[in-house]
Amino acid sequence: MASIDPYQHIIVEHQYSHRFTVTVIKATNVTKGTFGDMLDTPDPYVELYISSAPDSRKRTKHFNNNINPVWNETFEFILDPNQDNVLEITLMDANYVMDESLGTTTFPILSVKPGEKKQVPFTFNKVTEMILEFSLEVCSSTDLRFSMALCDQEKLFRQKRKNKVINGLRKLLGPEKTQDLNSTSRDVPVIAVLGSGGGFRAMIGFSGVMKALYESGVLDCATYVAGLSGSTWYMSTLYSHPDFPTKGPKEINKELMHNVSYNPLLLLTPQKVKRYVEALWKKKSSGQPVTFTDIFAMLIGETLIKDRMNRKLSHMQEKINDGQCPLPLFTCLHVKPDVSELMFADWVEFSPYEIGMAKYGTFMPPGLFGSKFFMGTVIKKYEENPLHFFMGVWGSAFSILINRVLGVSNNSKGSTMEEEIENLKPKHILGNDSSDSDDEMQEPKGTENAKAEEEYLRNNQASWVQRMLMAILGDSAIFNTREGRAGKVHNFMLGLNLNTSYPYSPLSGLCTQQSMEEDELDAAVADPDEFEQIYEPLDVKSKKIHIVDSGLTFNLPYPLILRPQRGVDLIISFDFSARPSDSSPPFKELLLAEKWARMNKLPFPKIDPHVFDREGLKECYIFKPKNTSVEKDCPTVIHFVLANLQFRNFKAPGVPRETTEEKESADFDIFDDPETPFSTFNFQYPNVAFKQLHDLMEFNTLNNINVIKQAMVESIEYRRQHPSRCSVSLNDVESRKLHHKDSQSKFQM
């Protein structure tokens, strides 16, 4: 891999931290005073405190009845050298009821020079002497990677995957249309498959899509598969399966159908809840935040991957290291308290190789996500989070499922996505983001309309489950506040300096796609305040950050795929978002993605919503650059929507339905059915409903394979015409600043 990273340190200002090491060696003549010593021999220990350090307080073990203790214990603090760092040393006496301070002194850390090691004596109460040893070193490297470039592992994956893609294209398109493709050719297009959110509806629909793409050979031509919320649940199920890709989606989807056919109440048996609580307690006692999302994560994991709850995101590397499968990309949002996610949200991307935020160019290995950081250095490392924790975070909007099971109010059956998630939006998050306090405001609970025979079971199970969880966790706010339902992790950007930054794209001002006029960018798609604060930076002083379902801003994971470094030519997106009715226009989420792309100076084809008026509802729509010589970096988008059209009359492309049974099985609506079998918050799918949704999306995909193949051919031709497509040199990159939307130069970041 190249040793020079042209994007290094262009987002986070280059800075160093100091590692301050303290060894508490010993103390002599520890005393509680003449009268105190007559009553009791001291049980001494030492407490170290640096207010400016993130992990600020350390302590030694205590010795019983020992006036000359020898500790020889070493502690480390990561410090910002630009702050006035002072060490506070307190000699303590351990007691059964309340520990007693025997004296406090301070030490200015500035008196220790980098590279120096020295012993310093301290005197307490005129007779007690304590010896400490100090050393200071500069941390020249960090645990975070500061860059907008792809990591070396992804670059290596792309090289290996290219050979697989070439073979896939040759097999799918034929030798005539792929005769000049080779592993060194820039003609090989980068193809991405996208799946939207939408709960189990999205997961099941995407399972049918992936089966069609796998069996048709299209998946062999893709470099990336990106998902959001419900689609990530299917991707997690697929990529964590021990037999994938040897065993394809057909067999794995049968297992999925079986798993989602059960009532979620069965997950709340005493034995299972005891296991959940033990895991939550272990996490909380280790110093990690625990919220409602952690509980939901366990339930979604038990439903979908119950036989592999110990699997990690990094384990997926074995599925992609040789380029055998497309690289899976997952996402969630970082949001701020009391700010709508439509106004401000940072997209967080997850891959088996890295987790981070491209907006700031900060990334880390999956095993470090959730650890305590300061100035880019890990100060407390935890075990890598299990995959099911991420599944809960990626689909955290659906933590409302727990409220339903536990009888908490939510009368959202049959409502649109916007109505269903209104109470979960980050603009309602309560509390101080930087606080470590668990004190949270209370919300009143209500009741949910349900069948009478289910109400008794729900109420009784809910009461004891709540009592057990709250008794052990001691935190009723987990159930009763919106903040408790948002995921929360330690802020990995704590203490960093964001003075220098870039737009999401380093190609700003260089990309030649047609730009939207300013009034077009100001035009609202879903909300007058949408994206109002997307140029605002993350709060690097907050100790923790909130992370939520990306579908709360817009329901398609385009930000992952639009990173210029990935250079994607063809995007095949599948939108399972809720609509008011089956006949409603299907472009709202796509229009939001387009607006977000324009505001971040990223190439995106013009989305014309009037195509719906001209052509009506279709299974898929194509949006491409109008002039490839001008918009040479712009990808082509094939946008599939959730619609039951030709499937009603054909059981396979070109194969008509003949029997009454065949016709009746396909005669169903998605959003207009009064029974709402495909509701966003339906978490139990009978086999019949599963097969209907799965087979519908499999059919719609296969029915448009020729559309996909033609777009692939055109993408190869675009590459041949523009060999410099999506490339950028260091000389092209200009310095920019983060700014408010209403600043004078609105998009000159």
Swiss-Prot record:
Function comment: Selectively hydrolyzes arachidonyl phospholipids in the sn-2 position releasing arachidonic acid. Together with its lysophospholipid activity, it is implicated in the initiation of the inflammatory response.
Residue span, C2 domain: 1-124
Binding sites annotated in the UniProt record for Ca(2+) 2: 40, 43, 93-95
Binding site for Ca(2+) 1: 40-41, 43, 65
Region feature Phospholipid binding, mapped onto this chain: 1-178
InterPro entries cross-referenced by the UniProt entry: Acyl_Trfase/lysoPLipase, C2_cPLA2, C2_dom, C2_domain_sf, LysoPLipase_cat_dom
Regulation: Stimulated by agonists such as ATP, EGF, thrombin and bradykinin as well as by cytosolic Ca(2+).
Biased amino acid composition, Basic and acidic residues: 442-452, 733-749
Transmembrane regions listed in the UniProt entry: none
Record field: catalytic activity: a 1,2-diacyl-sn-glycero-3-phosphocholine + H2O = a 1-acyl-sn-glycero-3-phosphocholine + a fatty acid + H(+); a 1-acyl-sn-glycero-3-phosphocholine + H2O = sn-glycerol 3-phosphocholine + a fatty acid + H(+)
Stated name of the protein: Cytosolic phospholipase A2
GO cellular component terms, A-Z: cytoplasmic vesicle; cytosol; endoplasmic reticulum; Golgi apparatus; nucleus
Organism the protein comes from: Xenopus laevis (African clawed frog)
EC category name: hydrolase
SMART domains: C2, PLAc
Superkingdom of the source species: Eukaryota
One GO term of the biological process aspect: glycerophospholipid catabolic process
Main location: cytoplasm
Domain notes: The N-terminal C2 domain associates with lipid membranes upon calcium binding. It modulates enzyme activity by presenting the active site to its substrate in response to elevations of cytosolic Ca(2+).
Subcellular localization, as worded in the UniProt entry: Cytoplasm; Cytoplasmic vesicle
Residues covered by region (Disordered): 428-452, 729-749
PLA2c domain location: 138-740
Record-annotated active site: 229 (nucleophile), 549 (proton acceptor)
